[in-house]
């Protein structure tokens, strides 16, 4: 493919302008930065060779798709990135016809590509359409990728898979697969070749050394592709992911092959922003920052729930060598980085492998250890069968610590942690509880550490809602805490961070209100609930979880069992819909869940 030099110059300028716009907006709004900057030339080349209106453009996770948004008619709206009612930080078909599929969770792209390729074949459109996938090296650590590659290699559907290799998942990529992709020279085949060749050529002089050197350089290029070639998928690379002319030429050749091809492109994370170039996970996802210095624009004064969890777990681990733990590619986000560094034989980042994380922790529990499986609420969805089959069926004492429970803000629909109460409550042998503040969190962790059955505790992104309620008492199984007692008809029941919302709402009302920290949703404190039913006949539930199957549902089931018919119950949980992105306050306001809005609803109902 002969591309005019003038066109290449135009595209290089376009890449520069795209990076400048991404930096300008992300420094203001926050967002995903390093991988986005690094992927710019790849995305521009994709749009030069393929047609995103007809060719399915599939971005794995899609947090690196900002350049794609800018190239598909959204430049004038890019200022609204991740804002409420603005552009989503991920691909979203309802936002643009150029976005093929919703994304946000890792390692789904190749399966989507296989499905799209099957549909294209069934429609007889293989001469006019081809799936184009961009996937990062971090996503290549998840098993779903290899399930898809396994079928793809067998069926040979035409597809171009661009492996964006910047050696950067959210944290350092973990495992054998990452080593294959990031360091061909580390392979035993290559090392053995080098060792034996050096011994051999010593006897044959400079000519043999020259030939051996050329063979060695060739093997550096061949080794990463062996795995894919053995699966039946053509491999091209590694190639320079920032050479726009080369990328266009290679993608055109890959397109013309009419079979599955992996193009291995090596990129520099943070490309174009010197402060972030090649840096670690700090620049993966960022809040607003000063573009000149790179300093964060503002820092929260309140301690985050994640920090509290990390401190509590560290304290427990120092005093009990049976405590172990795992996270799935989120050591920094979940607060486990320090524990992994201090106790590398007891705490592990297992890569993007939630199923494996859950089941491996179950085996540790079987062997007498006390595992803390630390995962974002939204990502435990990916290990649900393992929670049921490998943990609860065996009744093993694994603690599931669910970070980012509730609304997570700008990451939106794919990341909201609202379903865990509903999907975990249905599992036999599972105990569910939640702290409301820092002290109760430490007490909840102390309870979890000694509990001999499966359990889960949830906590929000950011800090807990601050209150002046009475101090928390130690956690006991199925025991709630009455925080405020009055003789009126109204009872507010809070669960987890919902306790703070209940308290803030109560301050806006003139009525005398009792407030109960439920603490345990499974099992419920039936004795306390029976007593409350004799004193209050208007109950209001506050929880940052889904209404369907949630806290209100659990209490209504209790009413049905106990034949309690006189209590009126209203639940302020999330309705049956996916929750959009935006600052948490803006999203909650749109749902009518700010304290002032809730106070008005309560007034209307009492």
From Swiss-Prot:
Keywords: Isoprene biosynthesis, Magnesium, Metal-binding, Thiamine biosynthesis, Thiamine pyrophosphate, Transferase. Catalyzes the acyloin condensation reaction between C atoms 2 and 3 of pyruvate and glyceraldehyde 3-phosphate to yield 1-deoxy-D-xylulose-5-phosphate (DXP). It is an enzyme of class 2 (transferase). It catalyses: D-glyceraldehyde 3-phosphate + pyruvate + H(+) = 1-deoxy-D-xylulose 5-phosphate + CO2. Thiamine diphosphate binds at residues 63, 104-106, 138-139, 166, 273, 354. Pfam families: DXP_synthase_N (PF13292), Transket_pyr (PF02779), Transketolase_C (PF02780). It comes from the Bacteria. Gene3D superfamilies: 3.40.50.920, 3.40.50.970. GO terms for cellular component: cytosol. One of its GO terms (biological process) is isopentenyl diphosphate biosynthetic process, methylerythritol 4-phosphate pathway. Homodimer. Its EC number is 2.2.1.7. This is 1-deoxy-D-xylulose-5-phosphate synthase. The lineage of its organism: Bacteria, Pseudomonadati, Campylobacterota, Epsilonproteobacteria, Campylobacterales. Belongs to the transketolase family. DXPS subfamily. GO terms for molecular function: 1-deoxy-D-xylulose-5-phosphate synthase activity; magnesium ion binding; thiamine pyrophosphate binding. Binds 1 Mg(2+) ion per subunit. Pathway: Metabolic intermediate biosynthesis; 1-deoxy-D-xylulose 5-phosphate biosynthesis; 1-deoxy-D-xylulose 5-phosphate from D-glyceraldehyde 3-phosphate and pyruvate: step 1/1. Mg(2+) binds at residues 137, 166. Its cofactor is Mg(2+); thiamine diphosphate.
């Amino acid at each position: 493919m002969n591309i005019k030099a003038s066109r290449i110059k135009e595209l290089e300028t376009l890449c520069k302008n795209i990076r400048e716009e991404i930096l300008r907006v992300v420094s203001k709004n926050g967002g995903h930065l390093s991988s986005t900057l690094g992927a710019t030339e790849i995305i521009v080349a994709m749009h030069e060779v393929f047609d995103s209106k007809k060719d399915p453009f599939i971005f794995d996770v899609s947090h690196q798709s900002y350049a794609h948004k800018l190239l598909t008619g959204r430049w004038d709206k890019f200022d609204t990135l991740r804002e409420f009612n603005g552009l989503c930080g991920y691909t979203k078909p309802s936002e643009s016809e150029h976005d093929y599929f919703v994304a946000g969770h890792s390692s789904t792209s190749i399966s989507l590509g296989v499905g799209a390729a099957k549909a294209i074949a069934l429609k007889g459109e293989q001469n006019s359409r081809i799936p184009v996938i961009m996937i990062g090296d971090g996503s290549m650590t998840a098993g779903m990728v290899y399930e898809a590659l396994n079928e793809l290699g067998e069926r040979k559907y035409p597809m171009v898979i661009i492996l964006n290799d910047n050696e950067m998942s959210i944290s350092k990529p973990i495992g054998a697969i990452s080593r294959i992709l990031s360091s061909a020279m580390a392979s035993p085949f290559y090392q053995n070749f080098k060792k034996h060749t050096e011994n051999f050529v010593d006897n044959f002089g400079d000519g043999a050394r020259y030939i051996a050197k050329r063979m060695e350089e060739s093997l550096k290029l061949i080794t990463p592709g062996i795995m894919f070639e053995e699966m039946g998928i053509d491999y091209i690379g590694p190639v320079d992911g920032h050479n726009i002319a080369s990328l266009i030429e290679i993608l055109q050749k890959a397109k013309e092959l009419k079979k599955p091809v992996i193009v291995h492109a090596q990129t520099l994370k943070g490309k174009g922003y010197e402060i972030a170039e090649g840096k670690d996970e700090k620049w993966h996802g960022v809040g607003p920052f000063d573009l000149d210095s790179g300093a964060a624009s503002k820092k929260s004064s309140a301690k985050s729930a994640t920090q509290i969890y990390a401190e509590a777990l560290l304290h427990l681990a120092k005093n009990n060598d049976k405590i172990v733990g795992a996270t799935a590619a989120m050591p920094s986000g979940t607060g486990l980085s320090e524990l992994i560094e201090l106790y590398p034989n007891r705490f592990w980042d297992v890569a993007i492998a939630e199923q494996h994380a859950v089941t491996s922790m179950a085996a540790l529990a079987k062997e007498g250890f006390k595992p803390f499986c630390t995962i974002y609420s939204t990502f435990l969805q990916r290990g649900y069968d393992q929670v049921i089959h490998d943990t609860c069926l065996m009744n093993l004492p694994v603690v599931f610590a669910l970070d980012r429970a509730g609304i997570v803000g700008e990451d939106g629909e794919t990341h909201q942690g609202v379903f865990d109460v509903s999907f975990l409550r249905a599992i036999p042998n599972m105990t569910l509880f939640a702290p409301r503040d820092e002290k109760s969190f430490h007490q909840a962790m102390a309870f979890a550490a000694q509990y001999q059955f499966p359990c889960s505790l949830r906590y929000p992104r950011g800090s807990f809602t601050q209150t002046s309620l009475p101090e928390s008492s130690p956690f006991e199984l199925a025991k709630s805490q009455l925080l405020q007692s009055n003789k009126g008809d109204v009872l507010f029941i809070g669960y987890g961070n919902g306790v703070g919302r209940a308290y803030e709402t109560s301050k806006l009302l003139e009525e005398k209100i009792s407030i109960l920290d439920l603490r345990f949703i499974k099992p419920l404190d039936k004795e306390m609930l029976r007593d409350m039913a004799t004193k209050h006949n208007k109950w209001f539930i506050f929880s940052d979880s889904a209404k369907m199957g949630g806290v209100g549902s659990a209490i209504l089931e209790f009413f049905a069992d106990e034949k309690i018919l006189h209590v009126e119950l209203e639940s302020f949980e999330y309705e049956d819909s996916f929750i959009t992105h935006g600052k948490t306050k803006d999203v909650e306001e749109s749902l009518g869940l700010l304290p002032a809005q809730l106070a008005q609803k309560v007034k209307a109902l009492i």
